[in-house]
Amino acid sequence: MDELSPAARIIGAVNTIVNENGKLIGHMTDGIGFVENLRDHGVDVKGKKLVILGAGGAATAIQVQCALDGATSISIFNPDDPFLDRAKGTAAKLKNEVPDCNVQVFCLDDPGKLKEEIEKADILVNGTLVGMKPHEDRSPITDKSVFRSDLIVCDVVYNPEETKLLREAKEAGCAKTIGGKGMLLWQGVAAYKLYTGLDMPVEEYKKYQAENQK
């Protein structure tokens, strides 16, 4: 790799490589997919406070891209495993790269701290696979009292399209619930642009997809 995008450099991974006049440029589009999916639902991460559950690949990409795109505060919660240490390393990088974004990392075994951080957050993100088929009966949030009318709840899980987390958040009256299927679409849109230099006909794709799901 000759160069890396800011997100790829901070994360230390790429999923899209573009040859620009003989120079190989590495990009990471997962976080872009998340941010653009939110924008597609009328939500901008700029100026927002987020709580992200998980510290795996998808959660890390989301954390980094949201910081780069202007989030003011990100609280990461993960079990006490090697991913927790990696999250702390990423947070340290972001402190240098994006000093205006306050990134903190917490262990998930402190439900009181999790509730406290969600109470201060604008957006709650499930960046784990909890709730993915065949475990649709699971949710990363067991205390439904954290849901409130002005909280936006997002899930990276795309199957089912509405997870238990999103369903319970909606039933509790949360402002918006956003599933993970759109994240897949928008990271593909970003990759399409990088590969071709053209804008992907997103609305045509959405129409085609809707017609073929009937």
What are the residue ranges of the model-derived segments?
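Active-site glycine-rich loop that binds ribose-phosphate moieties when present
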Residues: G33-L38, D44-V45, G57-V64, K93
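Adenosine-phosphate binding glycine-rich loop
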Residues: I152, V156-K214
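Glycine-rich adenosine-cofactor-binding loop
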Residues: M28, G47-A67, A71, N78-P79
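Structural beta-sheet core signal
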Residues: I52, I76, V153-D155
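Short helix-loop-beta connector
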Residues: E20, V43-K49, F147-S149
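Phosphate/diphosphate ligand-binding glycine-rich loop within oxidoreductases
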Residues: M1-H41
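Rossmann-like adenosine-cofactor binding region
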Residues: D100-T177
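NAD(P)-binding Rossmann-fold cofactor-contacting core
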Residues: D69-P99
